[in-house]
A protein has these predicted regions:
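Gly/Ala-rich phosphate-binding loop of Rossmann-like dinucleotide-binding domains
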Residues: 3, 105
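Glycine-rich phosphate-binding loops of nucleotide-dependent enzymes
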Residues: 50, 93, 106, 142, ...
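Conserved nucleotide-binding/hydrolysis micro-motifs of P-loop NTPases
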Residues: 16-18, 55-57, 95-97, 119-123, ...
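Residue-level signature of catalytic and energy-coupling elements of molecular machines
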Residues: 13, 21, 50, 74, ...
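Phosphate-binding/switch loop-helix module in NTP-utilizing enzymes
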Residues: 56-104
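Phosphate-binding loop that captures ATP/GTP phosphates
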Residues: 5-60, 64, 71
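Conserved Switch II/interswitch segment of TRAFAC-class P-loop GTPases
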Residues: 84-91, 97-98, 109-130
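C-terminal lobe/tail of nucleotide-utilizing enzymes
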Residues: 131-216
Length: 216
């Protein structure tokens, strides 16, 4: 969305053992390295990407690494890649408050985080842990996105809360998170990710949030 606004955008895929970013963007070519460093891949619209999957000989090979090795890879994605001038860089992290988030918060100049959650009440506790960790590390929480928030029927337009009532507003108020957005269960969006055409998908659910972040 920020790339569509003319901003130079990059994604560092820190979900080392479960990287999905390259597939969603339709990028499969292996990364190239020079004496100066690693050259990031580029998507159709020019989003710069770095992911461990773009370094594997076979993208279906598992990554069986312990925490310190994973943390080292994340650091190298920041220090050894020739990112160039970038307006916004997104770091995709795995769920939880483990080695990867700690490494990112300690090793990268993070301006803020966006938390992605789902409607189940149990997830609220996990969100609080993530918020508390960010604030312990003096990282601002910019907003929260509720994924799979509802399903909207194509025929009647009615919204069905498949995974139960949304707790987004309650969590945002309790954790003092200033911005919220909801993402529906959408078969067309899932198909676009599977086909590597996420950039071509036209959905307005995150437009307001993206605009507010771009203005920061």
């Amino acid at each position: 969305l920020l790339r569509r606004r003319g901003l130079s955008t990059a994604i560092l895929d820190a979900d080392v053992t479960g990287p999905s970013i390259p597939k969603a963007f339709g990028v499969h070519e292996q990364l190239m390295a020079t004496d100066e460093g690693i050259c990031p891949a580029a998507s159709t619209t020019g989003v710069k990407l770095v992911s461990l999957n773009l370094l594997l000989e076979n993208e279906t090979d598992p990554v069986v690494w312990r925490g310190p090795v994973i943390a080292g890879a994340v650091k190298q994605f920041w220090t050894d890649v020739m990112w160039g001038d970038v307006d916004f860089m997104f770091v995709d992290m795995p769920p939880g408050t483990g080695d990867v988030p700690l490494t990112v918060f300690q090793s990268l100049p993070v301006d803020g985080i966006l938390i992605v959650t789902s409607p189940q009440e149990l997830v609220g506790m996990i969100v609080e842990k993530a918020v508390n960790m960010a604030r312990m590390m003096n990282v601002p929480v910019l907003g929260i996105v509720e994924n799979m928030s509802y399903f909207q029927c194509d025929e009647c337009g009615k919204k069905h809360e498949i995974f139960g009532r949304s707790h987004l507003d309650e969590i945002a108020a309790q954790c003092e998170i200033p911005r919220t957005a909801r993402m529906p269960l959408n078969p067309a969006l899932a198909a676009a990710c599977d086909a590597g055409k996420i950039e071509m998908f036209d959905g307005d659910w995150l437009d307001e949030l993206a605009g507010e972040i771009a203005a920061l």
